[in-house]
């Protein structure tokens, strides 16, 4: 039983860290794109704000699932 809980917890944590990595790489790629093509900085700031809001929503969803799973784990003990 404990091994199964640990595997599920690791899977949830892996999803969350993958999302963080994807958004970090997205910010790097967007910055590189704007530097290469010399586009206006206003667009870049707007994209950063949009990416930050999307990242917050997605990470809150997965962090909420992770915390919910941890709470269920404590109730089983």
Curated annotation (Swiss-Prot):
Keywords annotated in UniProt: Cell membrane, Membrane, Transmembrane, Transmembrane helix
A GO CC term assigned to this protein in UniProt: plasma membrane
Main location: membrane
Transmembrane region(s): 22-42, 44-64
Domain of life: Archaea
Localization terms from the record: Cell membrane
Membrane topology field: Multi-pass membrane protein
Protein name in UniProt: Uncharacterized protein MJ0184
UniProt source species: Methanocaldococcus jannaschii (strain ATCC 43067 / DSM 2661 / JAL-1 / JCM 10045 / NBRC 100440)
């Amino acid at each position: 039983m404990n091994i199964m809980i640990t595997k599920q917890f690791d899977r949830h944590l892996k999803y969350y860290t993958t999302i963080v990595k994807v958004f970090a790489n997205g910010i790097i790629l967007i910055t590189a794109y704007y530097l290469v093509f010399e586009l206006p900085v206003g667009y870049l700031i707007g994209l950063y704000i949009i990416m930050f809001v999307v990242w917050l929503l997605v990470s809150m969803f997965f962090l909420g699932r992770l915390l919910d799973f941890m709470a269920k784990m404590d109730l089983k003990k």
